[in-house]
């Protein structure tokens, strides 16, 4: 008899190649069930069906297949404990050498629209996690593979160790497996927490944990003396872990942080309107809407071309040749878009070091933000609230035209993604100046206006927080600003409104603050 492997996978990537090499090169016998067994048989690979091996048929519509002593005994038996081996012999159980399992796609299922609880429940794997955990527990004696990316490393282990695996490799695979089952259970727990009546008032669970599988070791963190890694949250690639990198150097920690900030800004703009955001150090230095994608990029770049050098570019439409030509005219770190046509890709390849990423679903982002503090975590719902202009208040004598409201809305969308205290000066739905991260609001106002220069005349000013005094309003008016949008809520709102009326400005209060720290 050859060595025994159990194969039971939902993701069949690399399955046939692995199975064929196990059988032909290393003389394994395969136990399998359900769709996995059928795939192997269709490929002409010999399979022992689980039901034939255990003597028990699948029951309950396939809910019970591998939960059997002949399976779990073969996994959990300690090969160096005589009584365990006697138990195997007494019960006609063969020890397993390898277990290859991946799990039902629970997270992919609940991510779909209009999924019912009944549909979600059917994608909660029971037998898979049981086998994975059992094998990982007994890593001293057998190997577990929970992801197709480990198939080739496993085969190399066999070749390097005369058909065996090293203890270090088995222990590493056990650790990866426990991390996977932890993340899987966390996803299920989070889903059920979201179903409770309290979830509508407080969408955060009473127990919050963070789990991730290392996707890539990064060269360093924010600075060269800081180590860093990139982890995939959950069991399935989503967001940036599902993005395609068309070209360019390896992504850095800072690249990924900036890319996520860029993604958050660009999804504020409807895909029907070509839009571009350019960032440095997570703050936008140029954001614009255009009639074409190339125009949107050029407007955003020219808004602050000095800061845009070496920036991160986010586009809300697929890259076309005209936009690609514009992108190659200067040094950029990264470009992200929902797509890129073949001709555009050829043009971009002239700048081979530029990292070009394709993220079709730009709107797929985290529902919470997490900060680590000494002794704990701070978790909050992401600031994804959609502002409703119909609820805004025009508090000045001068009333805005529809065109002015569109300009104010543009600036407001950008200000939401600037570090507080945040001020954005814009015109023609293009940023002209951004004041970020100042300790007093009027300081940010002055920086934004200074960057805008003479172009500020006839422009608009957006503030992520209220004005504690009327000095910001007066400074803006002196530079030629015609309209201001801010949340309101200051004890001295009346002073700012009075100043706006005196100076002939439009002022709109949104009633919603957007601090960003």
Curated annotation (Swiss-Prot):
CDD domains: IMPCH. Pathway: Purine metabolism; IMP biosynthesis via de novo pathway; 5-formamido-1-(5-phospho-D-ribosyl)imidazole-4-carboxamide from 5-amino-1-(5-phospho-D-ribosyl)imidazole-4-carboxamide (10-formyl THF route): step 1/1; Purine metabolism; IMP biosynthesis via de novo pathway; IMP from 5-formamido-1-(5-phospho-D-ribosyl)imidazole-4-carboxamide: step 1/1. GO terms for molecular function: IMP cyclohydrolase activity; phosphoribosylaminoimidazolecarboxamide formyltransferase activity. Disulfide bonds: none annotated. Belongs to the PurH family. The IMP cyclohydrolase activity resides in the N-terminal region. This is Bifunctional purine biosynthesis protein PurH.
């Amino acid at each position: 008899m050859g060595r025994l492997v159990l194969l039971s996978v939902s993701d069949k990537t690399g399955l046939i190649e692995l199975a064929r090499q196990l059988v032909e090169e290393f003389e394994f016998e395969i136990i399998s069930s359900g769709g996995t067994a059928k795939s192997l048989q269709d490929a002409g690979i010999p399979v022992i069906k689980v039901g034939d091996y255990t003597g028990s048929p699948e029951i309950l519509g396939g809910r019970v297949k591998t939960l059997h002593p002949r399976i779990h005994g073969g996994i959990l038996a300690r090969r160096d404990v005589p009584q365990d081996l006697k138990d195997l012999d007494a019960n006609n159980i063969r020890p397993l050498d390898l277990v290859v399992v991946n799990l039902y796609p629970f997270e992919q299922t609940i991510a779909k629209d209009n999924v019912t609880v009944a549909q979600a429940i059917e994608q909660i794997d029971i037998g898979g996690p049981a086998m994975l955990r059992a094998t990982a527990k007994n890593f001293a004696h057998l190997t577990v593979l929970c992801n197709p990316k480990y198939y080739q490393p496993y085969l190399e282990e066999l070749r390097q160790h005369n058909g065996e695996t090293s203890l270090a490799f088995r222990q590493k695979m056990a650790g990866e497996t426990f991390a996977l089952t932890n993340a899987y259970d966390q996803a299920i727990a989070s889903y059920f927490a979201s179903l409770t009546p309290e979830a509508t008032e407080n969408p955060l669970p009473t127990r919050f944990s963070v789990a991730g599988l290392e996707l890539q070791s990064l060269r360093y963190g924010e600075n060269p003396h800081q180590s860093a890694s990139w982890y995939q949250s959950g069991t399935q690639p989503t967001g940036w872990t599902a993005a395609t990198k068309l070209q360019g150097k390896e992504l850095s920690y800072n690249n990924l942080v900036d890319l996520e900030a860029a993604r958050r800004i660009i999804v504020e703009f409807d895909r029907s309107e070509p839009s571009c955001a350019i960032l440095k150090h997570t703050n936008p230095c140029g954001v614009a809407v255009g009639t074409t994608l190339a125009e949107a990029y050029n407007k955003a770049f020219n808004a602050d071309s000095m800061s845009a050098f070496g920036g991160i570019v986010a586009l809300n439409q697929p890259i076309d040749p005209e936009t690609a030509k514009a992108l190659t005219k200067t040094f950029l770190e990264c470009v992200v878009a929902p797509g890129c046509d073949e001709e555009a890709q050829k043009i971009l390849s002239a700048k081979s070091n530029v990292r070009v990423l394709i993220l079709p679903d730009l709107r797929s982002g985290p529902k919470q933000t997490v900060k680590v503090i000494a002794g704990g975590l701070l978790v909050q719902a992401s600031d994804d609230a959609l502002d409703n202009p119909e609820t805004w208040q025009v508090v000045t004598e001068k009333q805005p035209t529809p065109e002015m409201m569109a300009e104010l809305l543009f600036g407001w969308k950008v200000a939401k993604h600037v570090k507080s205290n945040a001020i954005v000066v814009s015109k023609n739905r293009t940023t002209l100046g951004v004041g970020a991260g100042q300790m007093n609001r009027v300081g940010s106002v002055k920086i934004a206006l200074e960057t805008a220069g003479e172009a500020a005349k006839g422009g608009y000013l957006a503030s992520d927080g209220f004005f504690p005094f009327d000095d910001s309003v007066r400074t803006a008016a002196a530079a030629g600003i015609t309209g201001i949008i801010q949340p309101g809520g200051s004890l001295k709102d009346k002073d700012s409104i009075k100043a706006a009326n005196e100076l002939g400005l439009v002022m709109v209060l949104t009633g919603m603050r957007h601090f960003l720290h």
